[in-house]
Amino acid sequence: MAREPGVFAISVVAEMVAMPAQNLRVYERHGLLEPDRTSGGTRRYSRADVERLHRIRELLAEGLNLAGIAHVLALEAEVDRLRTECARLRRR
């Protein structure tokens, strides 16, 4: 499935998720988030990025550190991938 292109500026997303823009930059540096970039290097966030930031905020509220969050997000992505694969195999 193709990823939706990013359209939101960092200031807009920071407001949408009630986080300082600096936090978004930190999450990107830690590999938790990978926004698109314009040709000039400006970050552009998609709706999927916004959803991921909401999930990051939930995990932070549960007491996880950034390494723990990265692990949880990776496991959730793997579960999604496996569910898709199972559904594909069932259709055979």
Predicted regions and their residues:
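Long, leucine- and charge-enriched amphipathic alpha-helices
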Residues: 59-92
